[in-house]
Amino acid sequence: MAKIVECIPNFSEGQNQAVIDGLVATAKSIPGVTLLDYSSDASHNRSVFTLVGDDQSIQEAAFQLVKYASENIDMTKHHGEHPRMGATDVCPFVPIKDITTQECVEISKQVAERINRELGIPIFLYEDSATRPERQNLAKVRKGQFEGMPEKLLEEDWAPDYGDRKIHPTAGVTAVGARMPLVAFNVNLDTDNIDIAHKIAKIIRGSGGGYKYCKAIGVMLEDRHIAQVSMNMVNFEKCSLYRTFETIKFEARRYGVNVIGSEVIGLAPAKALIDVAEYYLQVEDFDYHKQILENHLLG
């Protein structure tokens, strides 16, 4: 059986359609790899791609995409609501079928080494590939963002895992690693007060005493004049989407603010969304494996 790996590179470009189209063309040009989905957000100025392929082809696709991004995205001119530190901000590998997390860790290291060797971009290994505990958390790795990275790389504890203590002048720094599937889930508020989104995000994220498997920040969607709580649900089975959604609604009420919508960025495991439906429909004795038609059709 072929080993199947998912790769979800995040690029610091969500406004220039020509560059986005170039990334799409690059992804589609690699044999053995399928581009399942991509989405771009102008306010975040960020694009998220989802690819799957065998364990060899996915490495080539990841490298070629990072290469294209490094040649076409200038971080010195980048402005957006989402935290970022590089043209390719983060490049995770996720085990999908007949492959282990440890094998994906090795894939991430091989890709990271090649990116640094051929493109001169410093690399931090993160999540399951992290070389020390504090580097497991992407937020800690990315703290300081592109503008603060030149100083950060000179700090005693923040030498890159690959490369010198000097950022790429236009492509910045990239985080590469292996991780389990996550859900990128954002909730929109009917307010233009970013402080409210910041306060709610602080309450629900694990680092603030909230949900252990939720990472959250407040961002402003300038084009819509609304604030947003932007989340990564790193383990949706232990911290469900409905739980964070309901908590955000509850906390927003103290400020006289309502939730006006939500969005899932990129692809999400079916079970993450089925759990939400099961909760709101109050389905009794539901069996995900037995009662979902597609599970039987797909074997």
Curated annotation (Swiss-Prot):
Annotated EC: 2.1.2.5, 6.3.3.2
Active-site residues, as the UniProt record annotates them: 82
Main location: cytoplasm
Compartments, as annotated in UniProt: Cytoplasm
Domain of life according to the entry: Bacteria
Keyword set includes Cytoplasm: yes
Protein name per its UniProtKB record: Glutamate formimidoyltransferase
Binding site for folate: 163-172
